[in-house]
Amino acid sequence: MNAIWIAVAAVSLLGLAFGAILGYASRRFAVEDDPVVEKIDEILPQSQCGQCGYPGCRPYAEAISCNGEKINRCAPGGEAVMLKIAELLNVEPQPLDGEAQELTPARMVAFIDENNCIGCTKCIQACPVDAIVGATRAMHTVMSDLCTGCNLCVDPCPTHCISLQPVAETPDSWKWDLNTIPVRIIPVEHHA
């Protein structure tokens, strides 16, 4: 029985020693992150869709900060994200990538042909914003309010029943941009 306790104590001491060495090394050899990259990464929508040409939002933020990449390539973030990045970097806002001529592109949303859906859940696993709901071997559907139109759910579908379709702007689908609405605060007088 003593041999077991000796082995437990030895392994515990080794774990403690190696943990202390790793803790010291992580602080001693730490690499400082670029604070500009961190701020840009916080502004980006974190959908990891790859529409900007980079595998995720962090690599795109690094490319903007370090390589001078254009700030207008984030499709899910749109103009709001581009304007925030332009303000952060003190650069001129640019027209969104690929739409220099058109002012507001049609918003695309994934649509599942429920007659052909086999319920494999591959689209649910691929969706970075959890806009697709359903269960194994059950009908799946897309919550259009959450869908960013990133196209990541289309390729994994084995029956090819997912397509991106433009959404017509209706009073139900139109989003108020509260930052562009002028708001004036009117002081209230209190009478005693």
UniProtKB/Swiss-Prot annotation:
Cofactor binding comment, as recorded: Binds 3 [4Fe-4S] clusters.
Region: Hydrophobic, residue numbers: 1-26
Domain 4Fe-4S ferredoxin-type, residue spans: 108-137, 138-167
Subcellular location: Cell inner membrane
Principal location class: membrane
GO annotation, biological process: electron transport chain
Keyword Transmembrane helix: no
Cofactor: [4Fe-4S] cluster
Keywords on record: 4Fe-4S, Cell inner membrane, Cell membrane, Electron transport, Iron, Iron-sulfur, Membrane, Metal-binding, Repeat, Translocase, Transport
Keyword Ribosomal protein set for record: no
Family annotation (SUPFAM superfamilies): 4Fe-4S ferredoxins
Binding-site list for [4Fe-4S] cluster 2: 117, 120, 123, 157
NCBIfam families linked to this entry: PRK05113.1, rnfB
The protein's role, per its UniProt record: Part of a membrane-bound complex that couples electron transfer with translocation of ions across the membrane. Required to maintain the reduced state of SoxR.
Name this polypeptide is given: Ion-translocating oxidoreductase complex subunit B
Organism: Escherichia coli O17:K52:H18 (strain UMN026 / ExPEC)
Lineage, highest ranks first: Bacteria, Pseudomonadati, Pseudomonadota, Gammaproteobacteria, Enterobacterales
Gene that specifies this protein: rsxB
